Amino acid sequence: MGLYVSRLFNRLFQKKDVRILMVGLDAAGKTTILYKVKLGEVVTTIPTIGFNVETVEFRNISFTVWDVGGQDKIRPLWRHYYSNTDGLIFVVDSNDRERIDDAREGLHRMINEEELKDAIILVFANKQDLPNAMSAAEVTEKLHLNTIRERNWFIQSTCATRGDGLYEGFDWLTTHLNNAK
């Protein structure tokens, strides 16, 4: 009985450590999202050459978030960050209609990688504050998200500068990572 109570207590209150890989095309808002969630404020960013890594505490999970640069020359290096990834956050600039096909190709290339087969997928349809931004439904269609089978995925409309949708996305991650581990 004591062992059962101890395990239940640990399951309910023990902090979990998870590894999150956050990627997307350049200028999608990845670094802005990372620091808005971490610090609660918008910071001035420059294009990420390489990566940023931060720990974000949310509910009972300690997220180690790897924000990897998205310039086309850097994208082949994304695979070096796949190992032990529990969740993938793919950030899309919803206002960038010209490169949505590039985003789709990058996302589908990643989700077909063996090292990411168990990672859950959260898509942030970012920059929803811009007047010509695609809705989450349109981004879902353009990214062919409905073709993703046997994978747990979710799309969340966001505005990184205002913080809209970010915590809802992390809430989804928390719920599904708790169920998976």
From Swiss-Prot:
Record-linked SMART domains = ARF, RAB, SAR
Alphabetically list the UniProt keywords.
ER-Golgi transport, Golgi apparatus, GTP-binding, Hydrolase, Lipoprotein, Membrane, Myristate, Nucleotide-binding, Protein transport, Transport
Binding positions for GTP? 24-31, 126-129, 160
A molecular function annotated in GO for this UniProt entry is: GTPase activity
Q: Which Pfam families match?
A: Arf (PF00025)
E.C. number(s) listed in UniProt: 3.6.5.2
Q: Does the keyword Protein transport apply?
A: yes
Query: For the lipid attachment N-myristoyl glycine, which residues are annotated?
Result: 2
Q: What are the coiled-coil residue ranges?
A: none
Q: Name one GO cellular component term.
A: Golgi membrane
Major place of localization?
Golgi
What this protein catalyses is: GTP + H2O = GDP + phosphate + H(+)
Question: Cross-referenced InterPro entries, in alphabetical order?
Answer: Arf1-5-like, P-loop_NTPase, Small_GTP-bd, Small_GTPase_ARF, Small_GTPase_ARF/SAR
Say which enzyme class the record assigns: hydrolase
Q: Which NCBIfam families match?
A: small_GTP
Annotated function: Small GTPase involved in protein trafficking between different compartments. Modulates vesicle budding and uncoating within the Golgi complex. In its GTP-bound form, triggers the recruitment of coatomer proteins to the Golgi membrane. The hydrolysis of ARF1-bound GTP, which is mediated by ARFGAPs proteins, is required for dissociation of coat proteins from Golgi membranes and vesicles. Regulates the transport of N-acylated AK2 to the parasitophorous vacuole membrane. May be involved in the activation of lipid kinase PIP5K.
Q: What binding partners and quaternary form does the record give?
A: May interact with GTPase RAB5b.
> Under which name does UniProt file this protein?
ADP-ribosylation factor 1
Native source organism of the sequence: Plasmodium falciparum (isolate NF54)
Lineage runs:
Eukaryota, Sar, Alveolata, Apicomplexa, Aconoidasida
**Gene transcribed to yield this protein:** ARF1
